[in-house]
Amino acid sequence: MHRVTITLDDDLMEKLDAIIAARGYQNRSEAIRDLARIGIQQTAAETTSGHCVGAMVYTYDHSKRDLPRKLTQSFHHHHDLSRATMHVHLDHDQCLEVTILDGNASELQHFADHIFAERGVRYGRLVTIPAEPPEAHEHHHEHDASS
């Protein structure tokens, strides 16, 4: 282990201490190690260039002019990346969607960036996990000749 000294401004130190208290860390070192690990994992996920799976989460105002149509067009244009979507009505105007994606990391990021940039999308986050590409396989189905 290495001993490291860092300098933090008062506001950042206050926020760190709040995290330590909320999560029950025994000391600041444990919290900083965990935060460093999270940052390293996030950076690795963001720079992944190979195949991955991911979850794209975003909220949007469905009453914004043409937004639902634009989102649908984007999903049809990127149909090869999208595996499933869950749609939730948060209130009269706001919707939450969670979409499971599968493909090249840069393509997933490009797709997510396009969705998040649409006017009326209020929050967006893409979480990716490196994964092996699926193997191509054939399906053989037996059919009853009498049907």
From Swiss-Prot:
Matches recorded under Pfam families: NikR_C, RHH_1
Cofactor note as given: Binds 1 nickel ion per subunit.
Domain of life: Bacteria
Keywords from the named record: DNA-binding, Metal-binding, Nickel, Transcription, Transcription regulation
Binding locations of Ni(2+): H76, H87, H89, C95
The UniProt record lists the keyword rRNA processing: no
GO MF annotation: an example: DNA-binding transcription factor activity
Keyword Electron transport: no
CDD domains registered for this protein in UniProt: RHH_NikR_HicB-like (cd22231)
Family affiliation: Belongs to the transcriptional regulatory CopG/NikR family.
Annotated HAMAP family: NikR
Cited function: Transcriptional regulator.
Protein name: Putative nickel-responsive regulator
Lineage, uppermost ranks: Bacteria, Pseudomonadati, Pseudomonadota, Alphaproteobacteria, Hyphomicrobiales
